[in-house]
Amino acid sequence: MKLAYWMYAGPAHIGTLRVASSFKNVHSIMHAPLGDDYFNVMRSMLERERDFTPVTTSVVDRQVLARGSDEKVIRNIVRKDGEEQPDLIVVTPTCTSSILQEDLHHFVRQAQLSSRCDVLLADVNHYRVNELQAAERTLHQIVEFYINKARKSGELSGPPRRTERPSCNILGISSLGFHHAHDLRELKKLLQDLGIELNLVIPQGASVHNLKHLGRAWFNVVPYRELGPMTARYLQEQFGTPYVEITPMGVVETARFIRQIQQVLNEQGIPVDYEPYIQEQTLYVSQAAWFSRSIDCQNLTGKKAVVFGDCTHAAAITKILAREMGVHVVWAGSYCTYDGEWFQAEVGGYCDQVLLTEDHTRVADAIAQVEPAAIFGTQMERHVGKRLRIPCGVISAPMHVQDFPIGYRPFLGYEGANQIVDLIYNSFTLGMEDHLLEVFGGHDTKEVIHKSLSADSDLIWTREAQAELNKVPGFVRGKVKRNTEKFARERGLTEITLEVMYAAKEALGA
C-alpha cells in the first residue's frame, strides 16, 4: 500500500467488484467504511446501464469497531440472499477494512449455512495487488469454484464433450473495461466470419451456472493481457483447451490472431485456410491498410509520439504507430509494472525507450522533456496534454465518461483498426493548423507555454524576450523556448533577454 495523489490502477476491491458485477445474477457485499463505496456511483455513471449496480456496502462504523463485524456481515449476506435471490454472493473487504484482520472466511462459512445461494470470499491480498491483478485472480477463483462444484455433484465427470462445430470462449470482457462492449461485438463478427461458434463469454453477461460448460469449447480467446490469461491457463490444465492470446489490434496483429486460430484448428483436425479472408479484409474491406499508404498518412512519417497505458493497449498502439503508420515513437510505457518483462519484449524494437512506472508525475515530466507531436495515453495523459497544449488520444484505461462512447467504437478487429487510424490521424496537429488558429484568433496565445510540469523554470524572461517568443509560431515555440533556456543554462545565465535569444538562435544555426 502507498498513499498516492492519483493512481492508474485502482485498489484491489475495484477489480473484484468489476468481475463480480459483470456476471448475471451475482451480488457483491463490500465490507468497507464509507469512502470506499464509490464503485456503485462510478459504474452507474460510466457504463450507462439500466440496471442497478449489484453491490451492497456492509459499512464498517464505530459500532463495528467496538463489537466486531461478524453479526453485521452475516446479516447482510442472508438479507441480500432473500431479497435479490442471486446465484452467488461475493464478499470482499477493502484495503482499509483489511486492517481489522477479521476472519471473513469464518463469516462466509456461517452465512452459507443460512443462505440458498453460494457465498464466496474473494481470495485477494489487498495490500499486494492492484485492481487489474485482483480482477484476474477473482475471475479465476469463480471459474475454479464452479468447475469443482460441478465435479463434486457429478455434473462434470470425465472430459467434457466438445461442441459439434468449432467454438471458442472469450475470456476477459468485463464491466468498466476500455471499449470492451464494442470489442466484444467486433470479435463476435470476426469469429462468425471465420465460421467459429461462440460457446461462452466471461465474465460479461455470463451465468455462473454455465461455467461448467467452458470445457466444451475447442479453444479460448484472451484478447487482453490484464484479464483472462490466468483462467485460460487453468482451463488448459483442466481440459487441455488451447488458447489464443494475440490481441487483434491493428491490421498486422489481427492477421496474426487469425493465423493462430487457423493453426489451433488445423492441429485439431480441421483443415481451414483463412489466408483468402485475411487478404480480402486487408486489401479491400479494411480502410486502415489503404490509408497507411496514402499521402495523408505520409504526413505523419517521422512525427514524434509517446504512448502510455496498460500493457495490452500501449504495446498494440506502439506497434501500429511505428510499423503501420511510420510514426517515430520516442518512448512507450505502461503502469502495469508487474508485467514489465513482457511489455519490454513486445515494444523494445518499436520505440527508443521503455518507461515502466505507476507515478504519473514521472510520465508527465517525460512528456514535457520530449515535446512530442501527439500523446497516446490514459485520462491522466489527456490532462497533461491540455496543460502542455499537446494533442492526446486516449487509448487505455483509466478513462473518463467520454471514453465510454454511445456509438460503435471498437479497438479490436478490422473495424477497430479503422477506428484506431482515425484516432491517431486526428490526434496530430497537421501542417500550419496551429499557426493559422493563432493568426485568426483561434485561441488565446498571450501566455508563453511552459514545458515543465514538476518544477517551474529557474530562468527569468524579460518582457521584451517574452514578447519576441510569443511571435514564434505555436507549433515550434516550445522548441525555441527549450533551446534558448538550454543555451542560457550552459553559460550560467539567470535572465533571458533579447540578446540571449538572438545569440542562442545564432549558436544553433536556427
Swiss-Prot record:
Question: Where's the active site on this chain?
Answer: 296
* Pathway(s) served: Porphyrin-containing compound metabolism; chlorophyll biosynthesis (light-independent)
On the tree of life, the source organism's domain of life is: Bacteria
Q: Which cofactors?
A: [4Fe-4S] cluster
Annotated keywords: 4Fe-4S, ATP-binding, Chlorophyll biosynthesis, Iron, Iron-sulfur, Metal-binding, Nucleotide-binding, Oxidoreductase, Photosynthesis
Q: Spell out the molecular function terms from Gene Ontology.
A: 4 iron, 4 sulfur cluster binding; ATP binding; metal ion binding; oxidoreductase activity, acting on iron-sulfur proteins as donors; oxidoreductase activity, acting on the CH-CH group of donors, iron-sulfur protein as acceptor
Q: Name one Pfam family in it.
A: PCP_red
According to the record, cofactor stoichiometry and binding are noted as: Binds 1 [4Fe-4S] cluster per heterodimer. The cluster is bound at the heterodimer interface by residues from both subunits.
**Where is [4Fe-4S] cluster bound in this sequence?**
36
Q: What EC class does the entry list?
A: oxidoreductase
Does this UniProt record's set of keywords contain Aminoacyl-tRNA synthetase? Answer: no
Task: Extract the InterPro entries matched here.
Answer: ChlB/BchB/BchZ, LI-POR_suB-like_C, Nase/OxRdtase_comp1, P-CP_red_C, Protochl_reductB, Protochlorophyllide_Rdtase
- Record: residues binding substrate: 431-432
Which catalytic reaction applies to this protein?
chlorophyllide a + oxidized 2[4Fe-4S]-[ferredoxin] + 2 ADP + 2 phosphate = protochlorophyllide a + reduced 2[4Fe-4S]-[ferredoxin] + 2 ATP + 2 H2O
Q: Name one GO biological process term.
A: photosynthesis, dark reaction
EC numbers: 1.3.7.7
What HAMAP family does the entry give? ChlB_BchB (MF_00353)
Q: How does it assemble?
A: Protochlorophyllide reductase is composed of three subunits; ChlL, ChlN and ChlB. Forms a heterotetramer of two ChlB and two ChlN subunits.
Role this protein plays: Component of the dark-operative protochlorophyllide reductase (DPOR) that uses Mg-ATP and reduced ferredoxin to reduce ring D of protochlorophyllide (Pchlide) to form chlorophyllide a (Chlide). This reaction is light-independent. The NB-protein (ChlN-ChlB) is the catalytic component of the complex.
Which NCBIfam families does the record match to this protein? Answer: DPOR_BchB
Q: What protein is this chain from?
A: Light-independent protochlorophyllide reductase subunit B
Gene that this polypeptide is encoded by: chlB
